[in-house]
A protein has these predicted regions:
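Alpha/beta enzyme core
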Residues: 1-6, 10, 16-170, 178
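Short glycine/threonine-rich catalytic loop with a Thr-x-Gly-x-Asp
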Residues: 173
Length: 178
């Protein structure tokens, strides 16, 4: 207990710990979960959706998922987008029943996307499919977040806002050192 220290905006845990944090929470901060088979995103869509559903049911305020890189890098953009849309649908259905609004962050894993063009395409794909935030990296790959990737993503957010009026958040994460 450190009353002089500010509270975090959020505490990030694996999906199965959402209920534990919710029960122990004595202050106002968000519970963020990394979900949908984090960090690789390698499983059946049904498994990912069930994990997201359970996390939101148990109190997650924000859900972070990793872009389906296997589909995206193979040029199967619709498969990658549909996965995000399905996650968004599950989040909205479950949170709606609870009278809550739960945010979706899509981690692009920009170090694996490699090119500014891929980073831009993934940014627009995630935003159009329903992401509330786009995030650079899990921190589990190398390279992770880079200033160059951040610039591309922020420029895409600006262009998307100008075209749609919808505000999207940006989260730089993974491999950031000071």
């Amino acid at each position: 207990s450190y009353p002089e220290w500010p509270l975090p905006a959020s505490i990030c845990v694996f999906s199965n710990f959402a209920a534990v944090v919710k029960e122990a929470r004595k202050a106002d901060f968000n519970i963020t979960v990394v979900s949908a088979c984090f960090p690789s995103s390698q499983s059946f869509l049904e498994v990912k959706l069930k994990e997201v559903e359970m996390a939101v049911e148990q109190g997650a305020d924000e859900v972070d998922i990793v872009l389906a890189l296997n589909a995206f890098l193979a040029g199967n953009y619709e498969v990658a987008a549909e996965e995000i849309r399905q996650v968004r649908r599950v989040i909205d259905e479950v949170a709606g029943k609870q009278g809550r609004n739960v945010h979706l962050k899509v981690i692009l894993e920009t170090g694996l996307l490699k090119t500014p063009e891929n980073i831009a395409n993934a940014s627009f794909l995630a935003m159009e499919a329903g992401a509330d935030f786009i995030k650079t990296s899990t921190g589990k790959t190398s390279p992770a977040a880079t200033p160059e990737a951040a610039v591309v993503m922020c420029e895409c957010i600006k262009l998307y806002y100008k075209a749609t009026g919808r505000k999207i958040g940006f989260k730089p994460a993974g491999g950031i050192v000071t």
